[in-house]
């Protein structure tokens, strides 16, 4: 599928281009982007403070609607077409993108602008849980 995507070269520019998005894998979903949060790391990539690969697609705090479900996820109750999902770690500065199983969570169909950042932050917190003997 051809879709638009946006990336930066690290020279304070944003490039819009077309992308041949691959089909989602068997444990992936395809997401139609509704909103994407702009993270501090996205700003650092834009300004050049954080080195990026050439044409690296940015965006990792997305919210969208599921448009396709991989065969391994169909019928599992995890997610279905039409569900709202919050995603993390995916190149969500695009009209459509794929999200791997484990990188998305189903969210209620409410006004998306109120949920994307809290969900993304919550996921990041869960992934960086303080362990025994950590200094705080």
Predicted segments, located by residue:
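Extreme N-terminal starter segment of soluble prokaryotic enzymes
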Residues: 1-3
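Short cysteine clusters
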Residues: 39
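NAD(P)H dinucleotide-binding glycine-rich loop of Rossmann-like/cofactor-binding domains
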Residues: 85-136
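Glycine-rich beta-strand-centered segment in the early N-terminal region that forms part
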Residues: 20-36, 47-91
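Extracellular beta-rich ligand/substrate-recognition surface
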Residues: 6-14
């Amino acid at each position: 599928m051809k879709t638009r995507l946006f990336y930066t070269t690290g020279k304070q520019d944003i490039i819009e281009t077309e992308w041949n998005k691959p089909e989602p894998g068997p444990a992936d979903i395809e997401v139609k982007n509704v909103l994407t949060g702009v993270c501090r790391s996205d700003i650092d990539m834009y300004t050049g403070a954080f080195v990026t690969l050439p044409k690296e697609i940015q965006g990792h705090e997305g919210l969208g609607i599921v448009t396709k479900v991989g065969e391994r996820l169909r019928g599992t109750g995890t997610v279905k077409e039409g569900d709202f999902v919050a995603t993390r770690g995916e190149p969500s500065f695009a009209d459509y993108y794929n999200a791997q199983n484990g990188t998305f969570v189903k969210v209620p169909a409410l006004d998306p602008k109120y949920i994307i950042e809290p969900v993304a932050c919550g996921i990041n917190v869960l992934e960086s849980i303080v362990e025994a003997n950590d200094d705080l």
